[in-house]
From Swiss-Prot:
It is an enzyme of class 3 (hydrolase). This is Thiol protease aleurain-like. The active site is at 165, 305, 325. The lineage of its organism: Eukaryota, Viridiplantae, Streptophyta, Embryophyta, Tracheophyta. PROSITE patterns: THIOL_PROTEASE_ASN, THIOL_PROTEASE_CYS, THIOL_PROTEASE_HIS.
């Protein structure tokens, strides 16, 4: 048994699944099924551990695609149980005919509590911070906008197992502002914000706000480049060096709490805007469409995840915000998602701000 457990769980499960079902379109050319001559023995092991169920094939593909490896029989059983619950959630949600679809992703073997601990980190009351200072002009706001088409939106990043979403929202806004101002791209240090911005009421891997990060950068004199101060995804001591500054902040502009008209004006005419919203349990499996929810809140105390609004539009008669996430390019729609516009859905316009670079 110990020899078998040292094998990747994905190999064990895919071997079993390939033999167990022909009607699901399993790729017969997959070389993984040739790993061992002891196919029947491996099948017996998997069945002994997990039992025969309709979820085994899906779990096998999941473990293989995301390189999941489990350290013991007990852990495999636990993760399979969690996976089944999440798969049932995805399937039941997709049957409701909603404006969005869910799909299995790298989070499918995590409980909701684990996911919250690893990925969310903007759960603070921002009402005292965000007194609106954005000025609406008479300029015509475009019907649709996608700042990616202007080439100023930096690539999607991955925050890892650290509640540092607020740092990625911050750097995303600054990278876009820098590119817009100076005509070239830049990658900025999230890790400096994790390590150094605590005096401005931020808490590293345990949360923070872009508006407070902008203030830190302004008074600190700048933010280092990613190359000079690379991301580790862990809290650490501050290693800021003024000689490695990539950008400086002259000021930051806040959107009035809940004012989607102001937010649309800013996103449409100025540049991408840092926003925060409440992630509810089904959102982590978002794949495409316009996300909407009747369970999320929209108060300053509800928001728990900071992201970057890079545009807006309409899909199947549903207006939406186009938003860049920090969960990697494989998540969602190539790292992006759409959130319903016009209802301050999940608080998307509750904590919004953007920087002015020097």
């Amino acid at each position: 048994m110990s020899v078998k457990l040292n094998l990747s769980s994905s190999i064990l499960l895919i071997l079993f699944a390939a033999a167990a079902s022909k009607e699901i379109g399993f790729d017969e050319s997959n070389p993984i099924k040739m790993v061992s001559d002891n196919l029947h023995e491996l099948e017996d092991t998997v069945v002994q551990i997990l039992g025969q169920s309709r979820h085994v094939l899906s779990f096998s593909r999941f473990t293989h695609r995301y390189g999941k490896k489990y350290q013991s029989v007990e852990e495999m059983k636990l993760r399979f149980s969690v996976f089944k619950e999440n798969l049932d959630l995805i399937r039941s949600t997709n049957k409701k005919g909603l404006s969005y679809k869910l799909s299995l992703n790298q989070f499918a073997d995590l409980t909701w509590q684990e996911f919250q601990r690893y990925k969310l980190g903007a759960a603070q009351n921002c009402s005292a911070t965000l007194k609106g200072s954005h000025k609406i002009t008479e300029a015509t706001v475009p019907d649709t906008k996608d700042w990616r088409e202007d080439g100023i939106v930096s690539p999607v990043k991955e925050q890892g197992h650290c509640g540092s979403c607020w740092t990625f929202s911050t750097t995303g806004a600054l990278e876009a502002a820098y590119h817009q101002a100076f005509g070239k791209g830049i990658s900025l240090s999230e890790q400096q914000l994790v390590d150094c911005a605590g005096t401005f009421n931020n808490f590293g891997c345990h949360g923070g706000l872009p508006s407070q990060a902008f203030e830190y950068i302004k008074y600190n004199g700048g933010l280092d480049t990613e190359e000079a101060y690379p991301y580790t995804g862990k809290d650490g001591g501050c290693k800021f060096s003024a000689k490695n500054i990539g950008v400086q902040v002259r000021d930051s502009v806040n959107i009035t709490l809940g004012a989607e008209d102001e937010l649309k004006h800013a996103v449409g005419l100025v540049r991408p805007v840092s926003v925060a919203f409440e992630v509810v349990h089904e959102f982590r499996f978002y794949k495409k469409g316009v996300f909407t929810s009747n369970t999320c809140g929209n108060t300053p105390m509800d928001v728990n995840h900071a992201v970057l609004a890079v545009g807006y539009g309409v899909e199947d008669d549903v207006p939406y915000w186009l938003i860049k996430n920090s969960w990697g390019g494989e998540w969602g729609d190539n790292g992006y998602f759409k959130m319903e516009m016009g209802k301050n859905m999940c608080g998307v316009a509750t904590c919004s701000s953007y920087p002015v670079v020097a």
